[in-house]
C-alpha cells in the first residue's frame, strides 16, 4: 500500500514543483514596467544611439521591433509617487491612470520608418514632460506607461 501511494504522490509532487518554478520565473507587471521604462541613471541618454542600445538591452527588440517606448530618468520612488497624484482616464478608458504633477526628464524612442526587424533603429528624443502611468496593487505601483504630455 505504501508503494502505491508513492506512485500517486510522486507525479503530483513533480507537477507542484513545476508550477512553483514556472511562477517564480514570471516577470510581474511592475517589474516589466521597470525593465521597459526606468533608467534612473540616464547616463548616456543624450547619445543619438541611446534608444538603439537600450531597446536591445532591455529585450524590446526580440521577435519584432517595439514601435514606441519611453524611458524615465528620475528616481524610482518619484515615479512610484505618481500613483498618488492626479487621477486621469487611461487611453483604453480605464480609470487607474495617474498624471505626474511636474514634468520629468524622459527619452522618447520611436522606430525609424525604414527600420525593419532584426535591425531595429530608433530616433532618440530627450524631453521634459508629464507622464501618465497605469497603477495597480497595494501599495499602488506603475504597471504601464500610458502617455507623456
From Swiss-Prot:
Listed EC numbers: 4.6.1.18
Cysteine-cysteine disulfides: 51-109, 65-120, 83-135, 90-97
Residues at which substrate binds: 32, 35, 66-70, 91, 110
Secretion signal, residue range per the UniProt entry: 1-25
Keyword list, A-Z: Disulfide bond, Endonuclease, Glycoprotein, Hydrolase, Lyase, Nuclease, Secreted, Signal
Location relative to the cell: Secreted
MF terms in GO: lyase activity; nucleic acid binding; ribonuclease A activity
Cited Gene3D superfamilies: Ribonuclease A-like domain
Active site (catalytic residues): 37 (proton acceptor), 144 (proton donor)
Main location: secreted
A single BP term in Gene Ontology: defense response to Gram-positive bacterium
Enzyme kind, highest EC tier: lyase
PANTHER family: RIBONUCLEASE, RIBONUCLEASE PANCREATIC
Subunit structure: Monomer. Interacts with and forms tight 1:1 complexes with RNH1. Dimerization of two such complexes may occur. Interaction with RNH1 inhibits this protein.
Function: Endonuclease that catalyzes the cleavage of RNA on the 3' side of pyrimidine nucleotides. Acts on single-stranded and double-stranded RNA.
Protein name per UniProt: Ribonuclease pancreatic
Organism (species): Abrothrix jelskii (Jelski's altiplano mouse)
Protein's gene: RNASE1
Amino acid at each position: 500500500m505504501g508503494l502505491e501511494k508513492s506512485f500517486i504522490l510522486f507525479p503530483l509532487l513533480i507537477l507542484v514543483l513545476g508550477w512553483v518554478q514556472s511562477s517564480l520565473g514570471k516577470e510581474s507587471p511592475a517589474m516589466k514596467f521597470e525593465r521597459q521604462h526606468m533608467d534612473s541613471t540616464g547616463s548616456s541618454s543624450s547619445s543619438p544611439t541611446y534608444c538603439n542600445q537600450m531597446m536591445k538591452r532591455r529585450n524590446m527588440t526580440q521577435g519584432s521591433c517595439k514601435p514606441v517606448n519611453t524611458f524615465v530618468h528620475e528616481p524610482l520612488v518619484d515615479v512610484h509617487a505618481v500613483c498618488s497624484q492626479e487621477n486621469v482616464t487611461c487611453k483604453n478608458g480605464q480609470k487607474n491612470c495617474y498624471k505626474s504633477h511636474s514634468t520629468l526628464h524622459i527619452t522618447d524612442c520611436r522606430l525609424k520608418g525604414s527600420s525593419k526587424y532584426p535591425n531595429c533603429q530608433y530616433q532618440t528624443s530627450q524631453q521634459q514632460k508629464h507622464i501618465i502611468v497605469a497603477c495597480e496593487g497595494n501599495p499602488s505601483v506603475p504597471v504601464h506607461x500610458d502617455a507623456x504630455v
